[in-house]
């Protein structure tokens, strides 16, 4: 039988040092959230497709398959909607501060270079309408990045209500909205100029400026306020100012008024995290006050933060933060009747491990191959050194 030894597109193996580093990062992040008072939650990797088939997730690239009863199921592409399902269907009392970590899966196109399997960690703050919920998410993200020693990172803020207000006033068709979204995401000056000419409105000056409205928070927000009198947009800008003033003492904060998240469920402040050594954002989140409505008749305010732990592992590696695993310095060869003594000796001796070879000569050969400097033999007679590497 010839097995296919290739991996599916967008997946990869992690070995030894990288796998250990990824494991430690996940532990650090979870521990940090626990210290801030978040309660851990876990959801299945497999969900029914209905959880992700709402208008909020129309663009999601899902791994779909049928279960044994013919029902359509998917591998979760994010954690937020499953947590929304849990909160809406279990009757847990609100408000809540939840944390999570686990695998997510997105069926990206081949040759795009994107990872289809990612390890994600994050928090969900549900039931708090106050702007302090956004502030907590941003502070938590900054705190995690500092704990992981990520160098030269920057937090970028946007506001989903700005884009929503613009398309509401323009009254665009679905196709036109998709085209407009693409122009905004690409910061296409020429394309937006052409769009405004074909779709004139009272927001022309503001829309034309959107591709340039990114950078230092205070200057950009002041410029944006001078370009419009629309109350909805001005309210969003003032909300951004409040958050910038609250969190700017902790990190470098910038804004991008053309920031449009991939998921449509965001309703308020949105944010991303970048670093000099990263090609793309590794932190994202925002407010989504209507997300839970797809699971229940009532809504609840919510804010979330997600971290791409694979990207953070790569960042730590590039920054030289990941330490080499502590090497084994002593190999313990033992006779079976002396196993209790060998086990006790290993527990008491740092950086030691048991040998699984039947003969001492094989244990010594293994030690030489893996550069283990010393081998001892534990028998009923006691402990004897049988190999010691010469020091140069």
From Swiss-Prot:
Taxonomically, the superkingdom here is Bacteria
Name the major location.
cytoplasm
**What InterPro entries does UniProt report for this protein, alphabetically?**
aa-tRNA-synth_II/BPL/LPL, HisRS-like_core, HisRS/HisZ, HisZ
Tell me yes or no: is Amino-acid biosynthesis among this UniProt entry's keywords.
yes
One cellular-component annotation, GO: cytoplasm
Q: In which pathway does it act?
A: Amino-acid biosynthesis; L-histidine biosynthesis; L-histidine from 5-phospho-alpha-D-ribose 1-diphosphate: step 1/9
Q: Which Pfam families match?
A: tRNA-synt_His
Localization (cell): Cytoplasm
**A Gene Ontology molecular-function term?**
catalytic activity, acting on a protein
Record keywords, A-Z: Amino-acid biosynthesis, Cytoplasm, Histidine biosynthesis
Q: Name any Gene Ontology BP term.
A: histidyl-tRNA aminoacylation
Its quaternary organisation is:
Heteromultimer composed of HisG and HisZ subunits.
| Similarity comment | Belongs to the class-II aminoacyl-tRNA synthetase family. HisZ subfamily.
What's the further remark here?
This function is generally fulfilled by the C-terminal part of HisG, which is missing in some bacteria such as this one.
Describe its function.
Required for the first step of histidine biosynthesis. May allow the feedback regulation of ATP phosphoribosyltransferase activity by histidine.
Instruction: Please identify the protein, giving its name as recorded.
Output: ATP phosphoribosyltransferase regulatory subunit
Which species does this protein come from? Listeria monocytogenes serotype 4b (strain CLIP80459)
Q: What is the lineage of its organism?
A: Bacteria, Bacillati, Bacillota, Bacilli, Bacillales
In the UniProt record, the gene name given for this protein reads: hisZ
